[in-house]
Amino acid sequence: MNAPGGRRKEGRRTHRPREQDRNVQLSKALSYALRHGALKLGLPMRADGFVPLQALLQLPQFHSFSIEDVQLVVNTNEKQRFTLQPGEPSTGLLIRANQGHSLQVPELELTPLETPQALPLTLVHGTFWKHWPSILLKGLSRQGRTHIHLASGLPGDPGVISGIRPNCEVAVFIDGPLALTDGIPFFCSANGVILTPGNAEGFLLPKYFKEALQLRPTRKPLSLAGDKETETQSGPKLSSRGGRRKIQQ
């Protein structure tokens, strides 16, 4: 519809996308502060990972957010990344990340999974093509975090809340009972993510891989064979600039 003078009149814009962007911004800021940056930011983190929410909101990057904003993100986060709980009168509300820490959190609420029967029937790690050759040769690494993250199913499976990204390209299925037999510990976080520190070097070795599955663009089994075959499993070929064919490594 044209407004007088020939200018086009736009319809009313909804504020919902802006609100969603704001919630994503807050969720990312919370994830960094509570998983990785608490010490750098001067936050008083307890041994169980909780920090006073009021102390968090006093940081410059949180000045535009309120307690209600945080409560909304905590309550609506699909992966249930955070927990809020009442604290002492002197501290008020407390908040923590349920998993994903690079910080040492010695008393994080984790349930030990000490027998094969305690483990989920499916243990799977999601990754991307660029990491697959290295994973197939060396195993899964916890890298800078305290644990390797596993899920009890693939993205979209019933009951799978967190532990695997929906855009993962490769799924690696783990033989949990075999790893337990070798002394590899497993835990379950408050939001259902299965966690393991791996071996002494922080790896879950390829000997514990049961199978692997390409998830994108279509699902199909992947070989767990050695070096030469690994080179052919670098994902779908993509056209690069100038018309050359390029394989993601």
Swiss-Prot record:
GO MF entries: tRNA 2'-phosphotransferase activity
Enzyme class of the recorded protein, top EC level: transferase
The protein's name in its UniProt record: tRNA 2'-phosphotransferase 1
InterPro entries: Ptrans_KptA/Tpt1 (IPR002745), RNA_2'-PTrans_C (IPR042081), RNA_2'-PTrans_N (IPR042080)
Taxonomic path: Eukaryota, Metazoa, Chordata, Craniata, Vertebrata
PANTHER family in the record: PUTATIVE PHOSPHOTRANSFERASE, TRNA 2'-PHOSPHOTRANSFERASE 1
Region (Disordered): 1-25, 220-249
Alphabetical UniProt keywords: Acetylation, NAD, Transferase, tRNA processing
Role description: Catalyzes the last step of tRNA splicing, the transfer of the splice junction 2'-phosphate from ligated tRNA to NAD to produce ADP-ribose 1''-2'' cyclic phosphate.
Catalysis performed (reactions): 2'-phospho-[ligated tRNA] + NAD(+) = mature tRNA + ADP-alpha-D-ribose 1'',2''-cyclic phosphate + nicotinamide
The protein's Enzyme Commission number: 2.7.1.160
The family this protein is said to belong to: Belongs to the KptA/TPT1 family.
Organism: Mus musculus (Mouse)
GO BP terms in the entry: tRNA splicing, via endonucleolytic cleavage and ligation
N-acetylmethionine: modified positions: M1
Entry coiled-coil feature ranges: none
